[in-house]
Amino acid sequence: MHNMSDIIEQYIKRLFEEADEDVVEIQRAHIAQRFDCVPSQLNYVIKTRFTNEHGYEIESKRGGGGYIRITKIENKDATGYINHLLQLIGPSISQQQGYYVIDGLLDKGLINEREAKMIQTIIDRETLKMDVVARDIIRANILKRLLPVINYY
């Protein structure tokens, strides 16, 4: 059985399919009521499953009529998505952000589960045992070297 975060994620992805557009607007209160959860659960799903690294942009307006607008970043091909990720990574990247990059590659079918697990192991803090600043820089360099390889092979 899936946990609530998985269920909410699938619901939002289904909204994209049904809308046949690259933009979906949802209301926190409506989703929370629909799934009988607290709005912070929805915030968690948005912040972890619909990130830039996953290929989405988020716009949020709080308050009574507040909404969350999720826009799918349109990359017609793998090269566009890889270039988008390369721009996002910058000089350093945290382990969690690195995992989001890997999840995005997996979601787009650019890598398989086995490759994702191998890349996660390579960029894991237990593999890169050094101070945080150096580790985040090395992690970014590893990902920036891997992404073009994923794109061309």
Swiss-Prot record:
Q: Pfam families from the xrefs?
A: CtsR (PF05848), CtsR_C (PF17727)
User: Record keywords: Transit peptide included?
Assistant: no
Keywords noted in UniProt: DNA-binding, Repressor, Stress response, Transcription, Transcription regulation
Q: Which GO terms describe its molecular function?
A: DNA binding
GO BP term, pick one = regulation of DNA-templated transcription
Is Repressor found in the keyword set? yes
Family from the record: Belongs to the CtsR family.
- The protein's role, per its UniProt record: Negative regulator of clpC, clpB and clpP transcription by binding directly and specifically to their promoter region.
What is the protein name given in its UniProt record? Transcriptional regulator CtsR
Q: Which organism is this protein's natural source? A: Staphylococcus epidermidis (strain ATCC 35984 / DSM 28319 / BCRC 17069 / CCUG 31568 / BM 3577 / RP62A)
Classification from the root reads: Bacteria, Bacillati, Bacillota, Bacilli, Bacillales
Q: Which gene encodes it?
A: ctsR
